[in-house]
UniProtKB/Swiss-Prot annotation:
PANTHER family: PHOSPHOETHANOLAMINE METHYLTRANSFERASE, PHOSPHOETHANOLAMINE METHYLTRANSFERASE ISOFORM X1. Its EC number is 2.1.1.103. It catalyses: N-methylethanolamine phosphate + S-adenosyl-L-methionine = N,N-dimethylethanolamine phosphate + S-adenosyl-L-homocysteine + H(+); N,N-dimethylethanolamine phosphate + S-adenosyl-L-methionine = phosphocholine + S-adenosyl-L-homocysteine + H(+). One of its GO terms (molecular function) is phosphoethanolamine N-methyltransferase activity. Coiled coil: none annotated. Pathway: Phospholipid metabolism; phosphatidylcholine biosynthesis; phosphocholine from phosphoethanolamine. GO terms for biological process: methylation; phosphatidylcholine biosynthetic process. This is Phosphoethanolamine N-methyltransferase 2. The keyword S-adenosyl-L-methionine applies.
Length: 437
């Protein structure tokens, strides 16, 4: 598989984020002068004004950069919160509002192999007041793996963080962004570990490996080398399963940096270049048109507020004849209890029923639309998994606390109650992008 050079991969993101806006001031901070010059060459078609700096100390001299790039410049400060804060303040102040900030950092030698989650969180929630009194920060576009490192060096922990400087409304909320909300509520590190114990190794969705394989096979025949986008890839079990079982190349995305840090650590151990991951929002990332044979999502899109926009983006990303398969939490047709409404609000879910999903799919232009209420199977799985915990409580308690145990038992029991009242459904959706007439 071919890969872009690191500077050209950076240029690719700049073109995506700027969406054609003019760029006249590109600043590069690279301790390695030779590597810094490769950015000059790559960005020359965009602008002749590309300046290279070899020290973070020079950052304070930069202002109004349209593009600010850091190439392996943070290795001495990434574990020091005070120095990181100073860096982010200087980087934000050096960038024009609407400008692009790209941070390339190779984390393979970090003792903490999940350092990417810590940095993503730190960068994503940082805010500072500029000279005009604006509350500014870095709006996350994506955290991607460096393609050259993946394919040439088998290093899966070399990253490019891509942000756009933005003015944010002041907030006193405990969670600053939706990614921050996910990682501090449902997908804490302990929460993820407990989910994985319940669902099975590498999975945090109902039924684990076997159920996922059964669902995946409903796509039909796969051919080695075909491509799949996995939205809400979690800790990566489904992506690696499709690559292992069918030879499909998978681009897995998730907004939870905690979950993807686990997926990335395991991918680095396994060295499977058929799989790559991005920490990003499916409603933000600019996928290439007509680029995937399949789009897959397991129990994720209930987190996404705009289903119409999501389906439109999936449609554009699929090749003609490509298929999309989604399982999702949905709402039933029974009168919703107050307890269920509270649960939905706490999880920040945006639930649809089967008819609403089918209507959106048809309106988007999909054909061969199939929907199915899989709630009876969901009930079976919930009973099996709750029973697994009750029968193996000693093992669970050797790894987790009483609080985690009680939370899982009550969560599974509550879902069974929601199912009985036809509040909570588990829905299946399969459709195809038509071939041109």
């Amino acid at each position: 598989m071919s890969s872009l050079s690191i500077p050209r991969q950076s240029l690719y993101y700049v073109n995506k984020v700027t969406e054609g806006r003019s760029v006249s001031n590109v600043q590069v901070v690279s301790p390695c002068q030779k590597q810094g010059q490769t950015y000059v060459t790559a960005f020359t078609p965009l602008t002749s004004n590309v300046q290279v700096h070899t020290s973070l100390e020079q950052l304070s001299t930069i202002r109004n950069a349209d593009v600010l790039i850091f190439n392996n410049a943070l290795s001495q400060i990434i574990t020091n919160a005070d120095l990181l804060t100073d860096f982010l303040k200087n980087a934000t102040n050096a960038t024009a509002i609407g400008g692009t900030v790209i941070i390339r950092e190779d984390l393979k030698d970090c003792s903490d192999k999940r350092q990417v989650a810590r940095l993503t969180d730190y960068f994503d929630v940082f805010r500072t007041t500029d000279s005009d009194g604006n509350n500014t920060g870095l709006d996350l576009y994506t955290v991607d793996q460096v393609e050259h490192s993946n394919y040439v060096e088998q290093n899966f922990l070399d990253f490019i963080f891509v942000f756009r400087k933005k003015v944010f409304a002041p907030t006193t909320d405990a969670t600053i962004t939706f990614r921050d909300f996910l990682d501090k509520t449902q997908y804490t590190n302990t929460g993820i570990d407990a989910y994985e114990w319940m669902f099975g190794v590498n999975f945090i969705s109902p039924g684990g490996y076997d159920e996922n394989l059964k669902i995946i096979k409903r796509f039909g025949d796969f051919k080695p080398g075909q491509t799949m986008l996995d939205i809400g890839v979690g800790i990566g079990g489904g992506a690696r399963q499709v690559a292992d079982e069918f030879g499909v190349h998978v681009h897995g995305i998730d907004l939870s940096s905690n979950m993807l840090a686990i997926a990335l650590e395991r991918l680095h151990e396994e060295k499977d270049s058929r799989v790559k991951y991005s920490i990003t929002d499916a409603l933000v990332y600019q996928f290439e048109d007509n680029s995937f044979d399949y789009v897959f999502s397991r129990d994720c899109i209930q987190h996404i507020p705009d289903t119409e926009k999501l389906f439109s983006r999936i449609y554009k990303a699929l090749k003609p004849g490509g298929k999309v398969l989604i399982t999702m939490y949905g709402k039933g047709y029974g009168e919703q209890s107050d307890k269920f409404k509270t649960y939905v609000a706490q999880r920040a879910y945006f639930l649809k029923n089967l008819k609403e999903i089918a209507d959106i799919a048809n309106k988007t232009g999909f054909v061969n639309v199939q929907t199915e209420n899989m709630t009876p199977r969901f009930k079976e799985i919930l009973l099996e998994e709750r029973g697994h915990l009750e029968q193996n409580e000693a093992e669970f308690m050797s790894k987790f606390t009483q609080r985690e145990r009680d939370s899982l038992i009550s969560g599974w029991t509550d879902k069974l109650g929601y199912i009985e009242k036809d509040n909570h459904n588990w829905n299946f959706f399969l459709a195809q992008k038509p071939f041109p007439k």
